[in-house]
UniProtKB/Swiss-Prot annotation:
A zinc finger (NR C4-type) spans 20-40, 57-82. It comes from the Eukaryota. The lineage of its organism: Eukaryota, Metazoa, Ecdysozoa, Nematoda, Chromadorea. Belongs to the nuclear hormone receptor family. This is Nuclear hormone receptor family member nhr-59. Orphan nuclear receptor. Gene3D superfamilies: Erythroid Transcription Factor GATA-1, subunit A (3.30.50.10), Retinoid X Receptor (1.10.565.10). InterPro entries: C.elegans_Orphan_NR, NHR-like_dom_sf, Nucl_hrmn_rcpt_lig-bd, Znf_hrmn_rcpt, Znf_NHR/GATA. GO terms for cellular component: nucleus. It is found in: Nucleus. Keywords: DNA-binding, Metal-binding, Nucleus, Receptor, Transcription, Transcription regulation, Zinc, Zinc-finger. It holds the Pfam family Hormone_recep. SUPFAM superfamilies: Glucocorticoid receptor-like (DNA-binding domain), Nuclear receptor ligand-binding domain. Residues 162-415 form the NR LBD domain.
Length: 416
């Protein structure tokens, strides 16, 4: 008789057996060629096919008793009994999943192409092109800024004013219904392209330089320090100045939720985000929709985060200039060499003394900690937006999304 046939007959003879042939407990059915309980079936499935440990007999004689409670059994003797009653590893079944599985993870399309998912739909005619990068010469702007910073004349000649008052004289945030001329001077920008961006860039550099020139102690420092300071701080200075100027406009329009549609870009420029047209061909090979995540005012709205806080605070011009000085000195202390740290600390102490004098003598406010707290809240929000922006720019550089070639790249490291 065929061995398989005899095995089937033997199994059929005991199929009605109600007890496990290994341990004597109540059986669960036929498992691997014998009638066993679930515990013995699981034991055989786990151990018989090759355990990761050496199975040894407990007493060393190979005659251990298989207890009916299924516990504390000798594994070697239990396995031997399983095999003696006809349990066979050939009855093991593998790969019974309804779908095929693989240990190898299939590469995603973004991994295969080497581009992030938000750029996968880009057209080969534009996004994959290798057009020559646009060269942008910043030398004229730098020359003008150096002339302002290195001018031997002290600006302004006002010995009776404090440092913060001198700084305030270089800025004017009065945008109100009573000053219709200033409101009409605001030029609405309908298109943001290369020429508009360069004009705004030049305006922001010169504004920061002229403001710093009103800081007498800063004016007396070395030229290398002054230009390095401008290089580190002009962007964060203009971010806060832009937020403050926008808040003044929104406050005048009685928009208190910080979600106005108009955002002031520079001293006399304003943009309506509902209608403005962005031209990005001069700094990228991708379309605007493909890289909107990286463009402020399109897919990146983080610049609006500090608006409500500064609208609620409503700082005076002296307080605003202190905020501008404090945030600039904070950024400079983190980016400039340690040899300049003492100089920066001294400048911070000078403006702090002026602010204290302003609160005590002019505002008659002996306890002003709450206003300091509100100022620091706005500055910290602007700094946080700046750090988040830097993270996005690092991703953009990794994938070569922005491709303009600047003559002085260190000056625009926080922009492109």
């Amino acid at each position: 008789m065929h061995p398989d046939s005899s095995r089937k007959l033997a199994l059929k003879a005991v199929v009605n057996q109600t007890f496990c042939q290994v341990c004597g407990q109540e059986s669960h059915g036929a498992h691997f060629g014998a009638i066993t309980c679930r515990a013995c079936a699981a034991f055989f499935r786990r151990v018989a096919a090759g355990a990761n440990f050496e199975v040894k007999c407990k007493d060393g004689r190979g005659r251990c008793k298989i207890l009916t409670n299924g516990r504390s059994c000798c594994k070697k003797c239990r396995l031997k009994k399983c095999k003696d009653i006809g349990m066979d590893i050939q009855n093991f079944q593998f790969n019974r999943d309804s779908f095929a599985t693989s240990t190898k993870v299939a590469p995603s399309l973004s991994t295969f192409l080497g581009r992030p998912e938000f750029l996968l739909s880009c057209s080969p005619g534009t996004s994959a092109s290798t057009s020559q990068n646009k060269f942008i010469d910043l030398s004229p702007f730098i020359k003008n800024c150096k002339q302002v910073l290195m001018d031997d004349r002290k600006i302004p000649l006002a010995p009776g004013k404090t440092r913060l008052q001198k700084l305030s004289s270089s800025l004017d945030f009065e945008i109100s219904a009573n000053n219709k001329k200033k409101k009409t001077d605001l030029r609405k920008v309908s298109t943001l392209g290369f020429s508009e961006a360069i004009q705004i860039f030049e305006n922001e550099l010169l504004m920061t330089s002229k403001w710093l020139a009103h800081f007498e102690e800063f004016h007396d420092l070395g030229n290398d320090f002054k230009f390095k300071f401008l290089e580190c701080t002009w962007n964060i200075w203009n971010r806060l100045e832009r937020v403050a100027r926008t808040a003044a406009l929104l406050r005048d329009q009685k928009i208190s939720n910080g979600k106005g549609n108009e955002i002031i870009l520079a001293r006399n420029c304003v943009i309506d985000l509902r209608t403005v047209k962005f031209e990005v061909e001069w700094f990228t090979n991708y379309s605007l929709s493909e890289i909107s995540y990286f463009i402020e005012g399109v897919g990146d709205w983080s610049m609006n985060k500090p608006l409500q806080a500064i609208i609620d605070f409503n700082p005076t011009e002296i307080e605003l200039n202190f905020m501008l000085a404090q945030i600039s000195l904070t950024c400079a202390s983190k980016q400039m060499d340690s040899q300049y740290q003492e100089t920066i600390d001294n400048l911070q102490k000078l403006i702090a003394d002026d602010l204290h004098s302003y609160y005590i003598k002019e505002m008659r406010l002996p306890v002003y900690s709450s206003r300091i707290q509100k100022m620091m809240k706005v500055n910290n929000m602007v700094l946080r937006v700046m750090w988040e922006r830097k993270e996005k720019l690092s991703i953009a550089r990794m994938f070569n999304i922005f491709n303009p070639n600047f003559s002085h790249p260190e000056l625009v490291k926080d922009v492109f």
